[in-house]
Amino acid sequence: MMKKNNSAKRGPQDGNQQPAPPEKVGWVRKFCGKGIFREIWKNRYVVLKGDQLYISEKEVKDEKNIQEVFDLSDYEKCEELRKSKSRSKKNHSKFTLAHSKQPGNTAPNLIFLAVSPEEKESWINALNSAITRAKNRILDEVTVEEDSYLAHPTRDRAKIQHSRRPPTRGHLMAVASTSTSDGMLTLDLIQEEDPSPEEPTSCAESFRVDLDKSVAQLAGSRRRADSDRIQPSADRASSLSRPWEKTDKGATYTPQAPKKLTPTEKGRCASLEEILSQRDAASARTLQLRAEEPPTPALPNPGQLSRIQDLVARKLEETQELLAEVQGLGDGKRKAKDPPRSPPDSESEQLLLETERLLGEASSNWSQAKRVLQEVRELRDLYRQMDLQTPDSHLRQTTPHSQYRKSLM
């Protein structure tokens, strides 16, 4: 509930209370208008008390008898008044009291002239402070009872220490599954801030006990899986007796936890039997691929090849004879001519030269065909030898392996 405070109102005070002293009093010159030749300035006694400004022609002790009274709530500010082009001493001591530009405000602007610039600054500061108090007078008159105070919703609330909530079991299992170590798994996920002697410690201890149990179970299952994976290869390797690995009978043996093997190390630990079986499987696979291969094209029979060779040889001889005749004919004609250095311009000579060139090309082609047929004959003989040697070599290769395996078993 809001009510007005009557102590700030103007009016006669109670008999028991003494009147407050004025903030500032003194003589200043007030601007009273302009005459014919100069400005009119008159000495006035000014009293500043509260939010009222009293102006009198003579010094008066009781403010009630002063006729000029101005309410400072109608004014906006007090500031220095100086003309830029004036060199007079009065220019440094003038100050004005400007009224506020509110509608209906009839307070006049007041212009004063202090005794000195220091006195001017003192009056400006005092009047500005009084104007500020006058504008805040309405707010100062309002008081609020203690019973009507608004209750703050969180001011008196108890402060609680908020710690991080513990991780869920699903999160713990996910972290444990991605862990690479078989030892202890430590998760510092609980932030202990001033724990109470009973509840927080017990909660943290129970959480850590559950975590240790889950980690121990996970590590045990991993060790069992690794031992089951490594045991068959270890049994096969132990079946082969190695004399250099025999230990003394009196020596004690301390069992150790099996070591995890990488994929590359697992490939290196294969037994001898597995290597031999893989080799036999590879050889059987090669034989199967050979059987599935398409048959090689049949080579010509020896009779056909010999007939082709005879034909090529006969054609080569005929071509060489014709070439020799043409060369002899051309040499005879060249010797019979008188001018030995004349170029062969006649058509017969050109025809002879062209015939000689063609016969030379034919002779070279027949020679190349003869060489090709000879190579074909050699390849046929080589294939025959390979076909005869393949079964015997296969039997020779398989027999030592089987005997060696029998000796190892």
From Swiss-Prot:
The record marks D310, L311, D345, S346 as: Cleavage. Residues 308-409 are annotated as: Negative regulator of AP-1 activity. The keyword Membrane applies. One of its GO terms (biological process) is lamellipodium morphogenesis. C-terminal fragments could be released during apoptosis via caspase-3-dependent cleavage. Induction: Up-regulated by IFNG/IFN-gamma and IL2/interleukin-2 or in C2C12 cells. Abundantly expressed in skeletal muscle and heart, moderately in kidney, liver, brain and placenta and sparingly in the pancreas and lung. Easily detectable in cell lines such as MOLT-4, HEK293 and Jurkat. Residues 136-308 are annotated as: Interaction with ATM, CKIP, IFP35 and NMI. The modification Phosphoserine is found at S227, S271, S342. Changing R137A: No effect on binding to capping proteins. Keywords: Cell membrane, Cytoplasm, Membrane, Nucleus, Phosphoprotein, Tumor suppressor. Residues 331-340 have a biased composition (Basic and acidic residues). InterPro entries: PH-like_dom_sf, PH_domain, PKHO1/2. Changing K135A: No effect on binding to capping proteins. Plays a role in the regulation of the actin cytoskeleton through its interactions with actin capping protein (CP). May function to target CK2 to the plasma membrane thereby serving as an adapter to facilitate the phosphorylation of CP by protein kinase 2 (CK2). Appears to target ATM to the plasma membrane. Appears to also inhibit tumor cell growth by inhibiting AKT-mediated cell-survival. This is Pleckstrin homology domain-containing family O member 1. It comes from Homo sapiens. The lineage of its organism: Eukaryota, Metazoa, Chordata, Craniata, Vertebrata. The gene is PLEKHO1.
